[in-house]
Structure formats: structure tokens, C-alpha cells
Amino acid sequence: MRILISNDDGVTAPGIAALHAALADYAECAVIAPDQDKSGASSSLTLDRPLHPQTLANGFISLNGTPTDCVHLGLNGLLPQMPDMVVSGINLGANLGDDVLYSGTVAAALEGRFLGGTSLAFSLLSRQPDNLPTAAYIARRLVEAQSRLVLPPRTVLNVNIPNLPLEHIRGIQLTRLGHRARAAAPTKVVNPRGKEGYWIAVAGDAEDGGPGTDFHAVMQGYVSITPLQLDRTFNDAFEQLDGWLEGLL
């Protein structure tokens, strides 16, 4: 088994070190990750400049690009052998509901969709690393179990782990994505020279976070697993759109 590990927190982040340590004796693991924090990069590719991989002392490969760049290069010649699966994380911070649209953690897993195995993205609901051992243990268990899993092609599992010691985790729930309320307005700032700028505000609170959602599961102490697919076609809208288009051209 060969696993490509990436993230969006950066190659020196504690989460990717914990994930690699958890998987290193299970599979042949290669780490390719951004050289700096690329949270919120989504599935962006770097197309305006060359990418320069650099192998660090610990064997991890640092790249001056996005999480998707990292996986794309890993699957297209940077590694001597093609990985069997992609595992992303462990992100310090939730990737729930609408977060998946912006998440570089989820995007890295999505870039592995062409492989035969199911890719996984792991996130811990904390900005602090205290419970990374919990997340790393759960990641190891799920990666081991993935070999017995048969899902449709191009499926990614988005895994969110409560910020709890392992003994307080109540179990695992399969969930759908919830939805967040609209984020607050960006914060306007002015630097000492009078130049204006803006900080993007934090994500909105859960607006659709009832039973069955990823929000609800983690708030109740359960690990949330949400299967994701790339196809965002809204099939239920076809009937209304057919009528709307009639006679336009």
C-alpha cells in the first residue's frame, strides 16, 4: 500500500506530522505539502509560475504551491511510484457543511479522485493540537478499514473529529453536509500609511445543523463521515429549467 499525504496547513504543521506517524508503519507514505499555510485554497492550481519541490530533512516534500498542486504533482510523476490512495490532514479546524467549498484539506483529497481507492480528508475541531492523538488514531483505523470499502468512483470521505480525548468519543456517524449562515462582513483595516485593507470574517454559525448533519454529529461527540462527490449537478432543478428555457432561442 502506497499513500500520498498532503494538507493545507503546511508541511511543518503538527497535524500532518501526526498523520504520517500514525500511518508510517501501515503503508509506504510520501508527504507532499505546501511550504506555508494554504487554508481556504480550495481546488486552486498554480498556473502563473513554476513549482519547485524541496525535500526536507525528515523526507517530507515542501512545495511552493497549493494543496491541489501537491497532489497533482504527486500523481503525475513527482513520486517514483503511483500512490494507491490520498489522505489529507489532519486539519486543525473543522471542515463542516459549506466549509468543503473552500477547504484545501478536502480539495487535496478530491484531487486523488482518479485513483482506485477512496480518498479521505481528516479535520479536528480545534485550532490547538492537544487532541491530535485522538484524530491520528481514528485516521489510522479508517485508512486500514478503507481497503474493505467499495464505493462509486470519485468518492471522497470527509471526516470531522470532535476535540475530545479518545475515551470520550461516542462513536462514528454517517452524515450529510449541514449549512452555515452567511459569514459576517469583512473587517476593514487601515495600515499606518493610511492604506485600506480587509480581513475576511470567520465562517457563519450552523444554520442547518440538525440531526443527520455533520454539525450535529460532532457536537454530540461523534466522528462525522460525509461521503462527497465532485458532481454538483442539481438534478431536481431540471424540470423548472426546462420550462424556463422553452422559447428562449
From Swiss-Prot:
Known role: Nucleotidase that shows phosphatase activity on nucleoside 5'-monophosphates.
UniProt-listed Gene3D superfamilies: Survival protein SurE-like phosphatase/nucleotidase (3.40.1210.10)
Designated name of the protein: 5'-nucleotidase SurE
Cofactor binding note: Binds 1 divalent metal cation per subunit.
Signal sequence bounds: none
Organism of provenance: Pseudomonas putida (strain ATCC 47054 / DSM 6125 / CFBP 8728 / NCIMB 11950 / KT2440)
Recorded coiled-coil stretches: none
Entry keyword set: Cytoplasm, Hydrolase, Metal-binding, Nucleotide-binding
Primary localization: cytoplasm
Gene of this entry: surE
Reactions listed under catalytic activity: a ribonucleoside 5'-phosphate + H2O = a ribonucleoside + phosphate
EC number per UniProt: 3.1.3.5
GO MF annotations, alphabetized: 3'-nucleotidase activity; 5'-nucleotidase activity; exopolyphosphatase activity; metal ion binding; nucleotide binding
